[in-house]
Every structure is written in C-alpha cells, then in structure tokens.
C-alpha cells in the first residue's frame, strides 16, 4: 500500500512544480507591472491618477479578499473557456494565476514604497521622466525586496 503511494509521488511532484512554475511566471508578468502602476498612480507619485489608482486598488482588494476555494469554484466557466476543462492540472493554473496577481501586485507596491522619496525627488530635479524614475530608480532599489516578496508568494 505504501509502495503504491510512493509510485504516485514523482508524477504528483511534477504536476505541482508545473502548476507553481506556470502560475508564478504568468502572475508575475501581470502582477509586477500592476504593482508598479498602483504605486505610480498613487497620491504624490510620478503619475498621480487618483481615479485609476482607486479603481485598481479596489479591484486588487476585492480579489484578494475572496477565499481561494470560492474563487476556484466561481471562475469555473472562465477556466473552461480558457483551458477547455474545469478539472486537471492545467485547469487549476487559471485560478492560481487570478488569485496570485493581486497578491503580487500589492507586495510589489509595498516594496516600491520602501524606496526613499528623496531618491525620486532627486531624479525629478535632474529632469527624469516618470518612466525613467520607475525604470532607473524605483525598480533597481526595490528589486531585492521584490524578489524576497515573490519567494513568499511561491
């Protein structure tokens, strides 16, 4: 009996690694820019767009507050539309991605907030554009924290 369960372990481990890897890659590709956008459009930030920030923040907060099992059941039709099935390893990736995107976005936003505002002011005084501030000041300074936060999500 134990040997039968042991035989299933490599396949189950492979499926788990597949689900985690794909969902983290896709969720990070969407969540990191979303987190940057959440920070950049905030009050007293480089792109200050109050309505966009409040809307994005509300969506992120709403999705983060839904328990995963309820989210998984609620998006079964969407999962069927994307994958063609609502069961299986590949079908489980869709709700994992949807649940991970807001979490990653909020963690990235938090990491970016840790960058001292004096660095942003210095870049602004030297004539940097909002894109340059994000790419050359915020992201490099926050990268160690972002990587640490992403390992938490995994």
Model-assigned labels for residue ranges:
Residues 1, 35-44, 79-81:
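Structural signal for alpha-helical transmembrane segments and their membrane-water exit/capping regions
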Residues 1-23, 49-57:
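Periplasmic/extracellular loop-to-transmembrane helix junction in inner-membrane transport proteins
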Residues 9-40, 150, 154:
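Transmembrane alpha-helix signature in integral membrane proteins
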Residues 11, 15-19, 64, 68-103:
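Loop-to-helix entry region at the N-terminal start of transmembrane alpha-helices
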Residues 17, 21, 130-154:
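Transmembrane alpha-helices
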Residues 29-36, 90-94, 98-120, 147, ...:
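Membrane-embedded alpha-helices of multi-pass transport/permease systems
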Residues 37-74, 96, 101, 106-110, ...:
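Cytoplasmic-entry segments and transmembrane alpha-helices of multi-pass inner-membrane transporters
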Residues 112-142:
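Short helix-to-coil transition segments within interhelical loops
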